[in-house]
Amino acid sequence: FEVRNNRLDQVFFGILLERSSEGIVSGNIITSKAKSQSTSGNGVHIWKSEEITVKNNEVIGLRDGIYLEFVNNSEIINNLCKDNLRYGLHFMFSDHDLYKGNIFENNGAGVAVMYSKFIDMQDNQFRKNWGSASYGLLLKEINDSELKNNIFEDNTIAISADNTNRIDYIENEFRNNGYAIRIRGAVYDNNFKRNNFLYNSFDVAYTGRLNNNKFSNNYWSGYSGYDLNRDGIGDVPFRPVTLFSYLVNKTPEAIVLLRSTFIDLLDFSEKVSPIFTPADLIDAQPQMKKIQW
């Protein structure tokens, strides 16, 4: 079946699919002017379905732009989800899915992927998701997945990871975010490789003392090391977790000291002799130049 090239204005729910398979939702424009989450619905709402393709749609001004629950082997491609009250895209209990080439901009809390596995996230843009409880991408209890070639720009928190394991973060760009990556509890065996971290207030915030996540060959705009043999790799490891990010996690009011000379001295002392931050959370091969892919 196909739901194609429709315009739906001032709707509560836009398109609702239940117990469906082998369908295409394409080229639709769905808009509303939702004022509160309790009085609004979702643009594209899919429940207990499989092999659904949602592509080239615009969903603006609803509660969730696209919502999937118990939806497997499906694709979310080249959609624009903007100005939605809660999430631009909301995954729950959905496995073996791809979302690629989407733009998620100025949504209440960005994108949430929860209680899922084998999710492929490629070439998406997460932009301008600002707020005290906002982020570009929330990962909660998601395993065995990959994020590649995504851009995170101007978000309060670009990625918030909680109880996520065996995730590969490859060749993504984190630009001008409050936090680039905020790692909560029970986050293990993740691999961060060849990403660009550009001018974020905090590149990595980490709440625990134990770490077995790997950072390698990333570019960090805050790296001040040297490359004597000119192989493009810094000769001194980079520690992305600062003491100040640890203090802000413990005492949020400390954020008023951001970029003060006193904080710079604290961060330097923690790099020399780590006490509060994980000593083994380092990038041993930081890149000297921004990575192109």
Each language-model region and where it sits:
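Sequence signature of WD/YWTD-type beta-propeller architectures
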Residues: L8, E18, I30, E50, ...
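Flexible loop residues that form catalytic
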Residues: S20, K33, S116, N200, ...
